C-alpha cells in the first residue's frame, strides 16, 4: 500500500515544479504506458510494438506481459500522473502557492492543504468519479480550482468543505481511507523507483474493498480518454485545428487522450497556464478561450461521465465488431496516414471502457476478460473467412461478386460447381431432379439473373443481362406471333361483328306477324317498348287519350285474374269498424255521387279510398272530417280551371299512382276494384268474417255496380 493519492480521477494535474520535465522521461513512459490492454494483447499489432512492450514488461516488473489480468486492466492507464506526483511531494508543504507559468493547468492539485490533510481531498475526488452521485451540481472546491486555472489567488481549502459529502460514504470506506492516510503520511517523498519496483498484487490490493475503491477511480482516466478521442470524430469542423505532434505519428493513434496530454506539456513548457488549458481541452471544447476557462474540473468530470453512460449502452455491444474491422485501419494510421486519426482511437477506447466496466467485480472480471478475448478472436476469424470466401468467389468466371449479394453468389457458385462436376459423373434421375430443384429454388428467389436455370437447360438465349421488362416484352411478342400464325382472326373488327349480330336479331323480330295466333304473342320475354308499339291503340275521348291493353297478353291476363281473386276475397273480409260509422260514410257517399260539374261526375270510388286509413278507432273522426274537405275542394279547382283543361290534383292520385278520369264504365269498375284491393291490403289480418254484415255489404256492392253501369 505504498502508492500515494496520485490515483485520483483528476489525472490531468501537472507537477508543481516550475522546471519542465525532460523528454526522456516521457519517452520512457510513452513506450508502454498508455496503450490499451487489448492493444497490448492484440496479435495483429506491429511487431515493433509487441517487442517494445515485452521489453518493458521484462525490465520493469510492474508491467507484466501476460500475467496478472486484474493488474493489467487497472495498470494500462499509466498516463495518470503518479510519477509526477512523486515529485510533487516536495512542494506539498506549502499551504498556499503562487502562480507560475511553467506548470500549465496542472496547478489544480497543489492548492490543497499540507500533506497531513490530503486524505480528505483524495476522498472528494473519488466521490466525483462516481457518476450516480455527481449528477447534480458541482462542489465549491471546483470553483477554487477554476480560479487557480485562471491564475488568480487560490483560496485555502477548508476542512468543512472537504467533509461536506462524507455522509454519503460507507463507514468501511472511511475507515479504510484513514488507514491509507496514515500510510501516506509515513512516506514523505518517494522517487520513481518506488513505483517501478512494486509488483505484488496483494500489496497493492489487500482487500476487495480496495479494488472497488480504486476500480471506480480508475474509470476516470479511461472515460476522459474515451471522451477526448470520440469528440473530434463527431465534430469534424474543428478537427484540422488539432495538429498531431510528430512523435504521435511515430507511435500510434489507439489511445490519444493521455498521449495528447503529455505532448501538450512537453512541447509548451514555458507557456502560461491559460494557454495550456485552452490547448489541452481543445478535444472537448473547440473554441475555449481565456475567458471561457471557468468551467470547473468537476463539471468536466460529470459531463464526461454522462457522455460515457450515454454512449456505452449504444456502442458497447458493437465494440467487438468495431475492434475486428478496425485493426487494419489502426495499422494504416501507424504508417502515417493521419487523415482521420481519431476514429480508431474512438473504437478501441470504447472497447477498453466496456471491458473495464466488467472488471468492477474482482471475482468475475478474469472470466469476462477471457470471454472478450475469445469473442474478438472469433470475430476476426469470421471476418477473415468472409474475406477469403469473397476472394474465392471473385476467382470464378461466371459470378459477379458484390458485398451485398453474398448469399446469392454462394448459391450461384454452388450451382456452377455442381454443373461442372455433373459432366464427369454418371447421370442419374436422382441427381438430375436434385439439380432441377436447386435451379427452381434459385429462380424463386427474386434475383436479377436467371442464368443458373438457362445454363442448366442449355438455352441459347443470353438473358443474364436483360432486365425484367425486356423479358416480359419478349414473352408478349412470342404470344402475338403464335396467335397470328396458328389462330388467324377473320378480317372483321369487333364492332362490325356485333353490329351484324344485332341486325340479324332485328330481322328475326320483324318477321313475326302481328295478328297471328294469340299463342305466339304470349311471350314473357317481350320488351316494354315492343309491347307498347304493337298493342297501343289511340282512343280519343273528350278529355284524355286512353291506352287499350291487348287482352291476349299474358301479363295482363295474370293481373286480371289477380284482381278477380281479390274481389272474391273482399266479400268475406270486413274491417273492425262499427256499422254506424259505415252508414254515415255511405250516406255521405250517396250525396257525393249525385254531384255534377259541367257534365263531369266524380268517380264513386273516391271516398272509398279513405277506408284504408281507418285502421284504428282514434283516427275515425279525422278521416270523416278530411273526407268532407276533400269532397268539395277538387270540384272548386275543376270549376276555376275548366277552361284550361287542367285536371283536379287530388282526384288523380290513388295510392301514389296518377290515374286519369274516365267515362267508360268498364274502366271505372276496374278502378273501383283496385281501390278496394288497396283498402283491404292495409287492413290485413285485422279483418274478420261476419255473417251479420255480409248481407249489408253485398247490398251496397249491388248499389255501387248499378251506379257504375248507369253511367
Curated annotation (Swiss-Prot):
- Regions of compositional bias (Basic and acidic residues) in chain numbering: 48-57, 163-197, 204-213, 220-242, 296-311, 318-349, 371-383
Compositional bias per record (Basic residues), positions renumbered to this chain = 1-15
Point out residues bearing the modification Phosphoserine: 15, 17, 78, 80, 187, 402, 578
Alphabetically ordered keywords of this record: Isopeptide bond, Mitochondrion, Phosphoprotein, Ubl conjugation
Provide the residue span(s) of the region labelled Disordered.
1-42, 48-67, 94-350, 371-404
Query: What molecular functions are annotated in GO for this chain?
Result: DNA binding; transcription coregulator activity
- Could you identify this protein by its name? BCLAF1 and THRAP3 family member 3
Q: Which gene encodes it?
A: BCLAF3
Amino acid at each position: 500500500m505504498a502508492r500515494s493519492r496520485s490515483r485520483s480521477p483528476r489525472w490531468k494535474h501537472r507537477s508543481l515544479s516550475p522546471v519542465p520535465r525532460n523528454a526522456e522521461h516521457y519517452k520512457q513512459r510513452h513506450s508502454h504506458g498508455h496503450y490499451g490492454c487489448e492493444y497490448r494483447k492484440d496479435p495483429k499489432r506491429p511487431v515493433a510494438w509487441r517487442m517494445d512492450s515485452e521489453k518493458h514488461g521484462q525490465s520493469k516488473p510492474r508491467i507484466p506481459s501476460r500475467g496478472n489480468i486484474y493488474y493489467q486492466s487497472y495498470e494500462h492507464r499509466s498516463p495518470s500522473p503518479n510519477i509526477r506526483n512523486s515529485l510533487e511531494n516536495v512542494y506539498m508543504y506549502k499551504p498556499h502557492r503562487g502562480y507560475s507559468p511553467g506548470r500549465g493547468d496542472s496547478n489544480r492539485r497543489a492548492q490543497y492543504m499540507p500533506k497531513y490533510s490530503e486524505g480528505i481531498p483524495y476522498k472528494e475526488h473519488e466521490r466525483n468519479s462516481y457518476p450516480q452521485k455527481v449528477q447534480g451540481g458541482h462542489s465549491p472546491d471546483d470553483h477554487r480550482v477554476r480560479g487557480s486555472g485562471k491564475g488568480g489567488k487560490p483560496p485555502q481549502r477548508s476542512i468543512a468543505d472537504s467533509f461536506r459529502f462524507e455522509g454519503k460514504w460507507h463507514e468501511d470506506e472511511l475507515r479504510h481511507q484513514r488507514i491509507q492516510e496514515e500510510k501516506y503520511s509515513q512516506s514523505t517523498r518517494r522517487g520513481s523507483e518506488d513505483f517501478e519496483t512494486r509488483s505484488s498484487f496483494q500489496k497493492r490490493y489487500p482487500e476487495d474493498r480496495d479494488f472497488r475503491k480504486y476500480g471506480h477511480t480508475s474509470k476516470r482516466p479511461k472515460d476522459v480518454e474515451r471522451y477526448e478521442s470520440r469528440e473530434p470524430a463527431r465534430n469534424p469542423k474543428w478537427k484540422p485545428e488539432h495538429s498531431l505532434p510528430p512523435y504521435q505519428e511515430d507511435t500510434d493513434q489507439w489511445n490519444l487522450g493521455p498521449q495528447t496530454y503529455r505532448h501538450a506539456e512537453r512541447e509548451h513548457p514555458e507557456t502560461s497556464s491559460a494557454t495550456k488549458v485552452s490547448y489541452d481541452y481543445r478535444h472537448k471544447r473547440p473554441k475555449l478561450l481565456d475567458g471561457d476557462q471557468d468551467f470547473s474540473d468537476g463539471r468536466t468530470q460529470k459531463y464526461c461521465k454522462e457522455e460515457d453512460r450515454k454512449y456505452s449502452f449504444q456502442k458497447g455491444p458493437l465494440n467487438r465488431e468495431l475492434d475486428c474491422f478496425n485493426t487494419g485501419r489502426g495499422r494504416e494510421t501507424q504508417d502515417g496516414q493521419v487523415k482521420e486519426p481519431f476514429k480508431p482511437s474512438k473504437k478501441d477506447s470504447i472497447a477498453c471502457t466496456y471491458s473495464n466496466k466488467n472488471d468492477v467485480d474482482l471475482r468475475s472480471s478474469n472470466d469476462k476478460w477471457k470471454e472478450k478475448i475469445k469473442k474478438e478472436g472469433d470475430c476476426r476469424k469470421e471476418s477473415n473467412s468472409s474475406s477469403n470466401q469473397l476472394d474465392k468467389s471473385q476467382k470464378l468466371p461466371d459470378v459477379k461478386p458484390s458485398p451485398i449479394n453474398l448469399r446469392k453468389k454462394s448459391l450461384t457458385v454452388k450451382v456452377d460447381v455442381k454443373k461442372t462436376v455433373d459432366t464427369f459423373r454418371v447421370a442419374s434421375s436422382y441427381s438430375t431432379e436434385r439439380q432441377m430443384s436447386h435451379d427452381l429454388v434459385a429462380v424463386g428467389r427474386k434475383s436479377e439473373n436467371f442464368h443458373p436455370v438457362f445454363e442448366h437447360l442449355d438455352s441459347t438465349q443470353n438473358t443474364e443481362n436483360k432486365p425484367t421488362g425486356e423479358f416480359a416484352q419478349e414473352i408478349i411478342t412470342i404470344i402475338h406471333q403464335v396467335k397470328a400464325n396458328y389462330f388467324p382472326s377473320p378480317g372483321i373488327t369487333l364492332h362490325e361483328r356485333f353490329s351484324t349480330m344485332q341486325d340479324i336479331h332485328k330481322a328475326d323480330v320483324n318477321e313475326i306477324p302481328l295478328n297471328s295466333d294469340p299463342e305466339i304473342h304470349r311471350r314473357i320475354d317481350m320488351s316494354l317498348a315492343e309491347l307498347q308499339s304493337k298493342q297501343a291503340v289511340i282512343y280519343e275521348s273528350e278529355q284524355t287519350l286512353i291506352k287499350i291493353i291487348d287482352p291476349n297478353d299474358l301479363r295482363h291476363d295474370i293481373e286480371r285474374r289477380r284482381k278477380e281473386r281479390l274481389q272474391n276475397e273482399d266479400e268475406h273480409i270486413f274491417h273492425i269498424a262499427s256499422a254506424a260509422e259505415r252508414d254515415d260514410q255511405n250516406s255521405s257517399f250517396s250525396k257525393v255521387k249525385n254531384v255534377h260539374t259541367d257534365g263531369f261526375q266524380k268517380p264513386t270510388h273516391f271516398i272509398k279510398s279513405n277506408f284504408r286509413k281507418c285502421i284504428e278507432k282514434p283516427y275515425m273522426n279525422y278521416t270523416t272530417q278530411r273526407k268532407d274537405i276533400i269532397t268539395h275542394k277538387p270540384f272548386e279547382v275543376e270549376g276555376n280551371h275548366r277552361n284550361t283543361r287542367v285536371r283536379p290534383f287530388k282526384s288523380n292520385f290513388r295510392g301514389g299512382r296518377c290515374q286519369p278520369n274516365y267515362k267508360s264504365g268498364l274502366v271505372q269498375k276496374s278502378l273501383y276494384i283496385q281501390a278496394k284491393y288497396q283498402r283491404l291490403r292495409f287492413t290485413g289480418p285485422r279483418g274478420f268474417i261476419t255473417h251479420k254484415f255480409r248481407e249489408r255489404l253485398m247490398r251496397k256492392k249491388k248499389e255501387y255496380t248499378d251506379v257504375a253501369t248507369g253511367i
